[in-house]
Curated annotation (Swiss-Prot):
Annotated source species: Haemophilus influenzae (strain PittEE)
Primary localization class, coarse: cytoplasm
A Gene Ontology cellular-component term: cytosol
TM region positions: none
Cell compartments where the protein resides: Cytoplasm
Disulfide pattern: none
Family label: Belongs to the methylthiotransferase family. MiaB subfamily.
Catalytic reaction equation(s): N(6)-dimethylallyladenosine(37) in tRNA + (sulfur carrier)-SH + AH2 + 2 S-adenosyl-L-methionine = 2-methylsulfanyl-N(6)-dimethylallyladenosine(37) in tRNA + (sulfur carrier)-H + 5'-deoxyadenosine + L-methionine + A + S-adenosyl-L-homocysteine + 2 H(+)
Broad class of enzyme this protein falls into: transferase
Protein name from the UniProt record: tRNA-2-methylthio-N(6)-dimethylallyladenosine synthase
Domain annotation Radical SAM core: ranges: 143-375
HAMAP family given in the database record: tRNA_metthiotr_MiaB (MF_01864)
Amino acid sequence: MTQKLHIKTWGCQMNEYDSSKMADLLLSTHGLELTEAPEEADVLLLNTCSIREKAQEKVFHQLGRWKELKKNNPNLVIGVGGCVASQEGEHIRHRAPYVDIIFGPQTLHRLPEMINQIRGGKSSVVDVSFPEIEKFDRLPEPRAEGPTAFVSIMEGCNKYCTFCVVPYTRGEEVSRPVDDVLFEIAQLAEQGVREVNLLGQNVNAYRGPTHDGQICSFAELLRLVASIDGIDRLRFTTSHPIEFTNDIIDVYRDTPELVSFLHLPVQAGSDRVLTMMKRGHTALEYKSIIRKLRAVRPDIQISSDFIVGFPGETAEDFEQTMNLIAQVNFDMSFSFVYSARPGTPAADMPDDVTEDEKKQRLYVLQERINQQAAQFSRRMLGTEQRVLVEGPSKKDIMELTGRTETNRIVNFQGSPEMIGKFVDVKITDVYTNSLRGEVVRTEDEMGLRIAQSPQEVMNRTRKEDELGVGRYHG
């Protein structure tokens, strides 16, 4: 009988990506097929996130439910991975001794051996080490699930913002070799993927080794990915302002595959708070990046992350954040009330903003962002938008759904052969979380792209010195 795997995932897109890789890996090594029902599973995996408050308690609450399943099925293998496992591995083992496997984000590729060890009689396995890039070398070939795909290009972060656990849970920055990234994307393109989202905790810090011992910058990687036949849309997340260099802005100038949408977290608009957060940039420097981007891409829309109620944040500091929001005119945000993360420098600061004040500030901030987002949506009414068709609409399976370049969901009537392709849609209705439209042009009528060699694309950034020797600039 086929064995089953159930994975519960919390947190960021990197965690979602990791979970999909776990599923692919265990299907190839153990024949484990995914199930949505934990009670059907032979292996249960919890992929955790430590960003939100009370992350530990959430983990133990979930494990308590699974403990009952283990009582009924002693052969059930339970594993805990992700950032909470990385931080609290030994604590999990002591408090929940029925957990068999504890693994970190960088050791998920060792899951097959860990499962074999447990089934071979070992009582428990804990591996939360940071073996650098080995993880990617041991994963199976990518499998496309629709026309969009995530591809991890780097892991970890060296920035050590005072509120953040990522450097402690995922380690320092490690970039995948450029050839590995391009090969994975080419494989996905052959399977019908049209849009790729490059992932990393600090994605624009990418410095990928090349086959000849050189280093490929993030800007160069973007151009190489854009040149892969079949890839017509390119996104990336999450980036950091201090790594957002002019050579990346140049890619927006001349690479139409790179979408006119950017998620660039700023966290606060007060320089005093940014300094306490150890962000490494000022509000003015952030605005300068946006100004340069809009000079080359006037239609680009920006989303961000904000933390309100950081230790020491005054009403005046918050007002400066609101001013920044108005000046940049963000289209969307992921906004959170500050809560201390164990082991971070900010956890030692006095948490002196009251919970009521934090909630009030969050409400005010989100209301402003929602107003700005609604204005952007209203401006789209009557316009034509290019939509990548992802499949049937969740609201009405007789309709199709897809996303615009600026990440808006659009629902419309269409035929099944449109799935996985682009259509141009005239926007007829605007709702809070989606748009509605009518198809005016199919992909066959677009003349989408002229094939270009990777060398032609790279030549956009290539200059020659006085001796005729090529050199990259940026």
